[in-house]
Design a protein with these regions (language model features):
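Sequence-specific dsDNA recognition surfaces
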Residues: 10-11, 25-74
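Conserved hydrophobic/aromatic beta-strand scaffold that supports enzyme active sites
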Residues: 45, 104, 149-151
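A short beta-sheet element
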Residues: 69, 74-132, 136, 143-147
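Non-catalytic DNA-recognition/assembly elements of restriction-modification systems
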Residues: 6-38, 149, 154-157, 161, ...
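Interdomain signal-transducing alpha-helices
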Residues: 115, 160-163
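Short helix-capping and inter-helix turn/linker motifs at the boundaries of alpha-helical repeat units
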Residues: 2-6, 138-142
Length: 179
């Protein structure tokens, strides 16, 4: 992708400049937290990993309380709040359910995979972590009440699609190099 012609300051430390024409928007203005509780008997269990949101393996350890899970709809962005620093998050391609430690974000409007890339980026993960709390890194968590005010860069929908197309192309090229 080409560099943009001009940039403007954001006033935000994790991303100090964005292209002119983009906006900085609070996560709360883009997503609503989905907190609906469901059963894993009605909604297939999903795992949130560094590879994204996937069907849970049959061999995965399950809680005894399968009734106490959060609903996930295809298109929701899900963050594993216990593995957020490892990038365990992504847009779910499936309807299903996740454990209560996950943050499920329902897009307010149609969203693109731009947010899948943005919210999994190293700089965002560090900002997400900075807004959390805990006694040690392994027991650190960021709640939606803390993350909802994080400002993120939002280009036009057309630019989002172009960015996703470019990143998909680069990822595919990289995946051919490393099997």
């Amino acid at each position: 992708m080409k560099k943009y012609g001009s940039y403007k300051p954001t006033g935000v430390s994790w991303i100090p400049y964005i292209p002119t024409g983009w906006n900085m928007v609070k996560i709360n203005d883009l997503f609503i937290e989905r907190r609906e509780k469901v059963s894993d008997k009605d909604y297939a269990p999903l795992s949130v990993t560094k590879f994204g949101v996937l069907p849970q393996l049959e061999t995965a350890v399950k809680t005894k309380d399968g009734e106490n899970r959060k609903k996930v709809c295809a298109g929701d962005f899900v963050i594993n709040s216990r593995s957020d620093r490892r990038g365990s998050s992504g847009i779910s391609p499936l309807d299903g359910s996740v454990s209560l430690i996950n943050i499920v974000l329902q897009p307010r409007k149609g969203t693109s995979y731009y947010f899948h890339y943005l919210l999994r980026s190293h700089t965002f993960i560090e900002e997400f972590y900075r807004n959390g709390r805990g006694i040690v890194a392994d027991l650190w968590t960021t709640r939606y009440s803390e993350m909802k005010n994080i400002l993120v860069p939002v280009p036009s929908y057309e630019e989002q699609l172009a960015i996703v197309e470019y990143l998909n192309w680069k990822s595919a090229a990289f995946n051919h190099i490393i099997p």
